[in-house]
């Protein structure tokens, strides 16, 4: 990872593929840089010349609106040239392999490739085939590191710290790359994490994660500083993981009554997209506790920071 002053740092090593690779110093550098980037959004001219002449390719093999748009806005605010590459209707849909696509990107001279793929590990393979930096924008059920970074950034903005916070992640942990990235990053930053889910929606290896496991949401909420609700990812399911949606919502949904048991300062987070009425009630999602809209805005600042640090952006960010 390239620091603000150009010094080489450990952790990302030219790429951002997993939060598990980040040291505490790496993570704090991204969050601190994102704070400076956030001030750019408040300026009269919301643009920096730091990546002028650089090319960032958004390579998305899965449909995405918010993440792709967020990376596009981030790169453009740093004055980079942006190429959006969608697998649908492209050579990929005609049978081109990921390696063939990588060779095409290499020929284009891409300085950074932001990759989302349905296969876990695809960005890691891509990073071995291209000379530019690779940013994992979500790979299968594996990781989504910039989402975890923006979540931590949001916690720090609202609560002043991440170290020492009690964070509860609720829902479809089994299929959630967001949960995995958050678990590793939050542990690195000193938070304590509890995951709450039906046994069928917990991964087999969860016992090796730095988390507590609970099946009782009501018992955990009163001791929680941040509760992060996850969507049930039916598109990744080939069988029934719980009896009915109504039963799931009754046991693991955050309704108004449950939210009232949270400490007064506690936050409600959701990486989106939300299924209102299932994992979260509309009144809770739209309440003052909710950071859903802030998370979207903060995503641009965090992704600006990641691109700036990976590509060794020129000039100071005040």
Swiss-Prot record:
It catalyses: carbamoyl phosphate + L-aspartate = N-carbamoyl-L-aspartate + phosphate + H(+). It comes from the Bacteria. The keyword Lipoprotein does not apply. It is an enzyme of class 2 (transferase). L-aspartate binds at residues 94, 177, 231. Its EC number is 2.1.3.2. GO terms for molecular function: amino acid binding; aspartate carbamoyltransferase activity. The keyword Lyase does not apply. Keywords: Pyrimidine biosynthesis, Transferase. Heterododecamer (2C3:3R2) of six catalytic PyrB chains organized as two trimers (C3), and six regulatory PyrI chains organized as three dimers (R2). Belongs to the aspartate/ornithine carbamoyltransferase superfamily. ATCase family. Catalyzes the condensation of carbamoyl phosphate and aspartate to form carbamoyl aspartate and inorganic phosphate, the committed step in the de novo pyrimidine nucleotide biosynthesis pathway. This is Aspartate carbamoyltransferase catalytic subunit. It comes from Frankia alni (strain DSM 45986 / CECT 9034 / ACN14a). The gene is pyrB.
């Amino acid at each position: 990872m390239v620091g603000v002053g150009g010094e080489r740092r450990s952790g990302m090593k030219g790429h951002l593929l997993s939060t598990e690779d980040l040291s505490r110093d790496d993570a704090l550098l991204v969050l601190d840089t994102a704070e400076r980037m956030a001030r750019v959004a408040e300026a009269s001219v919301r643009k920096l010349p730091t990546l002028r002449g650089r090319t960032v390719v958004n390579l998305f093999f899965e449909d995405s609106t918010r993440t792709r748009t967020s990376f596009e806005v981030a790169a453009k605010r740093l004055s980079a040239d942006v190429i959006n590459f969608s697998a649908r209707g492209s050579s990929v849909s005609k049978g081109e392999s990921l390696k063939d696509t990588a060779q095409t990107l290499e020929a284009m001279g891409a300085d950074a490739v932001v990759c989302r793929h349905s296969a876990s590990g695809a960005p890691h393979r891509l990073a071995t085939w291209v000379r530019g930096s690779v940013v994992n924008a979500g790979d299968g059920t594996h990781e989504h590191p910039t989402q975890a970074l923006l979540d931590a950034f949001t916690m720090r903005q609202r609560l002043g710290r991440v170290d020492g916070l009690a964070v509860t992640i609720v829902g479809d942990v089994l299929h959630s790359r967001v949960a995995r990235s958050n678990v590793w990053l939050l542990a690195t930053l000193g938070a304590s994490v509890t995951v709450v889910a039906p046994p069928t929606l917990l991964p087999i290896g969860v016992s090796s994660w730095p988390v507590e496991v609970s099946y009782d949401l009501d018992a955990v909420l009163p001791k929680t500083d941040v509760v992060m609700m996850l969507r049930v990812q039916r598109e990744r399911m080939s069988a029934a993981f719980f009896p009915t949606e109504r039963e799931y919502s009754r046991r693991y949904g955050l309704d108004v009554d449950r939210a009232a048991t949270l400490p007064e300062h506690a936050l409600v987070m959701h990486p989106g997209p939300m299924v209102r009425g299932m994992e979260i009630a509309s009144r809770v999602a739209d309440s003052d506790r909710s950071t859903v809209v802030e998370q979207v805005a903060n995503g641009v600042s965090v992704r600006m920071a990641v691109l700036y640090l990976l590509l060794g952006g020129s000039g100071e960010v005040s």
